[in-house]
Curated annotation (Swiss-Prot):
It comes from the Bacteria. This is Acetyl-coenzyme A carboxylase carboxyl transferase subunit alpha. Component of the acetyl coenzyme A carboxylase (ACC) complex. First, biotin carboxylase catalyzes the carboxylation of biotin on its carrier protein (BCCP) and then the CO(2) group is transferred by the carboxyltransferase to acetyl-CoA to form malonyl-CoA. Keywords: ATP-binding, Cytoplasm, Fatty acid biosynthesis, Fatty acid metabolism, Lipid biosynthesis, Lipid metabolism, Nucleotide-binding, Transferase. It catalyses: N(6)-carboxybiotinyl-L-lysyl-[protein] + acetyl-CoA = N(6)-biotinyl-L-lysyl-[protein] + malonyl-CoA. PANTHER family: ACETYL-COENZYME A CARBOXYLASE CARBOXYL TRANSFERASE SUBUNIT ALPHA, ACETYL-COENZYME A CARBOXYLASE CARBOXYL TRANSFERASE SUBUNIT ALPHA, CHLOROPLASTIC. It is found in: Cytoplasm. Pathway: Lipid metabolism; malonyl-CoA biosynthesis; malonyl-CoA from acetyl-CoA: step 1/1. One of its GO terms (molecular function) is ATP binding. The lineage of its organism: Bacteria, Bacillati, Bacillota, Bacilli, Lactobacillales. Its EC number is 2.1.3.15. Acetyl-CoA carboxylase is a heterohexamer composed of biotin carboxyl carrier protein (AccB), biotin carboxylase (AccC) and two subunits each of ACCase subunit alpha (AccA) and ACCase subunit beta (AccD). Belongs to the AccA family. Residues 1-235 form the CoA carboxyltransferase C-terminal domain.
């Protein structure tokens, strides 16, 4: 699949969402809401569910599948209260010893005036800091777009995976082309230079695993992700805490 098709597929409105994975993978998934400071952000969803006999905290960025739903979800662009909700749930997981799984699909954090006034940069930076030392295993999965700091704020993890037809980048190809050449129409040319596809990032050791989507139905893909999570969470849970945190630290220091 060429780069243009991969970008289109990553942005496809019918693509599986965080809630699709959360309800399909985890038994008795219960959503939790709000950051306890300002309001609930529909762009970030999270809660607790069971993976076998293991309770897991699930957090992710949610895009809509219709115009009305996208308006509710702010087209998957979180406000600072969304990132603060995510952090609240992750600290709750740490307190009770639950591993964390994050699902990421965003073009980036919302850049509006109100979001900046409420501390968008601080909220993202705090998540990076807190996740780097969170004392439970973390697995992050990019399921569509992984855009800029808005994606990284949920991706400081022990393992970072990508679905095969997803992308992960410092900014959109359109933004890159506009900055570099003052011509947004050269977006796909920019995408080739940026190395944003799953297999390119796996080769550069930015991500740890690519989950194949070829020939799989939605149910089969969810089942595949569930199996991978069960195996990897069991492995990570056996690591001594000091080793887990040191490996996470070194994983990001190497860049």
């Amino acid at each position: 699949m060429n780069i243009a098709k991969i970008v289109r597929e990553a942005r496809e409105q019918s693509r599986l969402t965080t809630l699709d994975f959360a309800t399909g993978i985890f038994d008795e998934f219960i959503q939790l809401h709000g950051d306890r400071s300002f309001r609930d952000d529909g762009a970030v969803v999270g809660g607790i569910g069971w993976l076998g006999d293991q309770a897991v905290t699930v957090v992710g960025i949610q895009k809509g599948k219709s115009l009305q739903d996208n308006l509710k979800r702010n087209f998957g662009q979180p406000h600072p209260e969304g990132y603060r909700k995510a952090l609240r749930l992750m600290k709750h997981a740490e307190k009770f010893g639950r591993p964390v799984v994050t699902f990421i699909n965003t073009a980036g954090a919302y850049p509006g005036v109100g979001a900046e006034e409420r501390g968008q940069g601080e909220a993202i930076a705090r998540n990076l800091m807190e996740m780097s030392d969170l004392k439970v295993p973390i697995i992050a999965i990019i399921i569509g777009e992984g855009g800029s700091g808005g994606a990284l704020a949920l991706a400081v993890a022990d393992r970072v995976w990508m679905l095969e037809n997803s992308i992960y980048a410092i900014l959109s190809p359109e933004g890159f082309a506009s900055i570099l050449w003052k011509d947004g129409s050269r977006a796909m040319e920019a995408a080739e230079l940026m190395k944003i596809t799953s297999h390119e990032l796996l080769e550069m050791d930015v991500v740890d695993k690519v989950i194949s989507e070829v020939g799989l139905s939605s149910k089969e893909l969810i089942k595949s992700v569930k199996k991978e999570l069960q195996t990897e969470l069991a492995r990570l849970s056996q690591k001594p805490l000091e080793e887990l945190l040191e490996e996470r630290y070194q994983r990001f220091r190497k860049y």
